[in-house]
């Protein structure tokens, strides 16, 4: 038996409105394909009871749909940060790893001398939603810094 002290696990404090302070939350994601082959991705993010959305539209294809999901998330993050982060989506990949589908996104933050950002998400059920969530994972630290300095 070890004598090591086990750290206690606590939940972050919850503000009176039920919100956890200091985090941008994923609210919803939708993707629609038109009969003409166009795809539209829409994401809603939430912070302190307010919502920010991002939308991306383009030609629908398996790879193009992933990019639309990621671009919609990038637009929502930039909208939340009043376009001050200088984020740019570089690429999106869906790979099979460890018997699971994983979406990986690569982005840069031009406002910080081209800092490279990478995020991933296990996307077995919905790869387009996974691409949007991978963007949120990639930008998590940048958003945390933004929130502490605003």
Q: Which functions belong to the PLM regions below?
A:
Residues 31-52, 101-113:
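Short beta-strand elements
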Residues 1-11, 46-50, 147-150:
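Intrinsically disordered, low-complexity regions
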Residues 26-41, 51-53, 81, 85-96:
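Conserved P-loop NTPase/AAA+ ATPase motor core
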Residues 36-38, 64, 68, 126, ...:
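Conserved active-site and cofactor/substrate-binding residues in soluble primary-metabolism enzymes
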Residues 53, 111-150:
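Mixed-charge, glycine-accented linear interaction segment located at domain edges/termini
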Residues 45, 49-79:
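Acidic (E/D-rich), amphipathic helical modules within compact regulatory domains
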Residues 1-41:
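Non-catalytic linker/capping segments at the edges of enzyme domains
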Residues 75-127:
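Short, solvent-exposed interaction modules
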């Amino acid at each position: 038996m070890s004598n090591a002290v086990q750290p206690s696990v606590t939940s972050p404090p919850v503000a009176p409105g039920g919100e956890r302070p200091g985090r941008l939350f994923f609210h919803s994601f939708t993707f629609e394909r038109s009969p003409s082959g166009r795809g539209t991705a829409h994401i809603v993010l939430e912070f302190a009871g307010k919502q920010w959305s991002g939308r991306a539209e383009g030609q629908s294809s398996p790879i193009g749909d992933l990019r639309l999901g990621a671009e919609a998330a990038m637009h929502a993050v930039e909208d939340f940060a009043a376009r001050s982060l200088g984020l740019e989506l570089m690429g999106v990949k869906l790979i099979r790893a460890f018997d699971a589908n994983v979406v990986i996104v690569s982005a840069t933050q031009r406002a910080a001398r081209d800092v490279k950002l990478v995020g991933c998400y296990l996307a077995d059920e919905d790869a387009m939603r996974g691409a949007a969530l991978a963007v949120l994972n990639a930008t998590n630290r940048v958003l945390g810094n933004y929130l502490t300095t605003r």
